Amino acid sequence: MTLFPIFADLTGRRVLVVGGGAVAVRKTQALLQAGAEVVVGAPRLDPALAALAEQGGIARLDGGFEPAWLAGAWLVVAATDDRAVNAAVSEAARARRVFCNVVDDAELSSFQVPSVVDRSPLIVAISSSGVAPVLARRLRERIESLFDHSLGQLAALAARYRPRIRAARPDLGQRRRFYDWLLDGPVAARLRQQQPGLAEQELEQALRAPQAAPRGSVVLVGAGPGDPGLLTLKALRALNEADIILYDRLVSEGVLALARRDAERVPVGKLPGKGHDATQARIHALMLAQARAGRRVVRLKGGDAFIFGRGGEELEYLRAHGVPYEVVPGITAALACAAYAGMPLTHRDHAQSVRMVTAHCRADQDTLDWAGLARDQQTLAFYMGVGQLDYVTARLLEHGRAPATPFALIENGSRPEQRVVTGTLADLPEIARRRGVRPPALLVIGEVAALADTLQWFGQHQRGLPGPQALAA
């Protein structure tokens, strides 16, 4: 360890910033956030610094650097683009035993400013000892993705209740388990949901119940269409905090690979024609049993849980049984598959609206407004439609949709094996059969589908019926 990590209390303490440009602006703003009394010395000031000086937010020293500027300073930051000036600041600071940071110059610095993840009062600092600042910034970005912004509120709440927690849990082992519950349980969940009052109620109840059984929870997470890079930061955090993951058939291996290594994984996917209602009842029972056992359950669904994902039914069940829950949206197939096919769902010249439709309705029910769906100047996105292509095509043509309307079938959208098959509505079922389209596939119908022929950028693209050679193969 070449540098000793230290956090300095600069509240009300004089810090000198030498330089008046953009770098000096950033350093000054950071120091002001830490409560420092900032003095900026430079011949000219950036407008932002000049405004701060006029408002009394900082003091100003005009002209070129002079060692006398260091009088009373606890720290100095040299932020000029002139190495000779920076060296003079460094030498003067060394002579007066004042710590000096020269921006982007480790050789002239006696301290380094780390990359910071700020969840005040929790602060995470990352330093490369001045050797590789880019690496430190990259690590900061990754750490930022792991910590919800409510973590600072949680740290402040824990600090405020620390004496009471110590009194209620005098045994060290009990206290550690209580803090684990505090960090991972319903209190943290309430803060993530922007409900600080309810968070404090949860904490008060736990303190009044000396040995309360652990209380589990469920997070309903949308996994997106398959590309793990489309997972949201909040979804990633949920996967890394899960004790058990109940995942659907269409969740990709790449997404599951991002989950906590020791989390239990239970597949609960539904297969076509295999009794969905019975499977859904099993999912409900599993969520309830695992949550009541005190476990953190992630219910992981392909796409978005609230777009043809039966997420609403699952929340109703959890609410009826008193299980706390959260919802993390995912990128639904219509948005992701269209984007990966290079196909805008709306376009000023072609479509002023989008309709997401399930082609997999409840048995013996078809309540769709086919006359409305057949209108032009709109885009239709059919989910779960591969087995219903003949029916969908017939109904749209019957209600007046033009036979020449373009379509696109996006198979395995956003995954390495993605394939886009395009053509016109009249030939849709035949093209799909001859091309061997298989689920999962999203069907897009509308003028925008033709743009996939020219704007496609990812995976394979096949247009129309296969030629004789392809048929022979």
UniProtKB/Swiss-Prot annotation:
InterPro entries: 4pyrrol_Mease, 4pyrrol_Methylase_sf, 4pyrrole_Mease_sub1, 4pyrrole_Mease_sub2, CobA/CysG_C, NAD(P)-bd_dom_sf, Siro_Cobalamin_biosynth, Sirohaem_synt_dimer_dom_sf. NAD(+) binds at residues 22-23, 43-44. Residues 216-473 are annotated as: Uroporphyrinogen-III C-methyltransferase. Residues 1-203 are annotated as: Precorrin-2 dehydrogenase /sirohydrochlorin ferrochelatase. Pathway: Cofactor biosynthesis; adenosylcobalamin biosynthesis; precorrin-2 from uroporphyrinogen III: step 1/1; Cofactor biosynthesis; adenosylcobalamin biosynthesis; sirohydrochlorin from precorrin-2: step 1/1; Porphyrin-containing compound metabolism; siroheme biosynthesis; precorrin-2 from uroporphyrinogen III: step 1/1; Porphyrin-containing compound metabolism; siroheme biosynthesis; siroheme from sirohydrochlorin: step 1/1. It catalyses: uroporphyrinogen III + 2 S-adenosyl-L-methionine = precorrin-2 + 2 S-adenosyl-L-homocysteine + H(+); precorrin-2 + NAD(+) = sirohydrochlorin + NADH + 2 H(+); siroheme + 2 H(+) = sirohydrochlorin + Fe(2+). Gene3D superfamilies: Cobalt-precorrin-4 Transmethylase, Domain 1 (3.40.1010.10), Methyltransferase, Cobalt-precorrin-4 Transmethylase, Domain 2 (3.30.950.10), NAD(P)-binding Rossmann-like Domain (3.40.50.720), Sirohaem synthase, dimerisation domain (1.10.8.210), Siroheme synthase, domain 2 (3.30.160.110). One of its GO terms (molecular function) is precorrin-2 dehydrogenase activity. Keywords: Cobalamin biosynthesis, Lyase, Methyltransferase, Multifunctional enzyme, NAD, Oxidoreductase, Phosphoprotein, Porphyrin biosynthesis, S-adenosyl-L-methionine, Transferase. Then it catalyzes the NAD-dependent ring dehydrogenation of precorrin-2 to yield sirohydrochlorin. Finally, it catalyzes the ferrochelation of sirohydrochlorin to yield siroheme. This is Siroheme synthase. The gene is cysG.
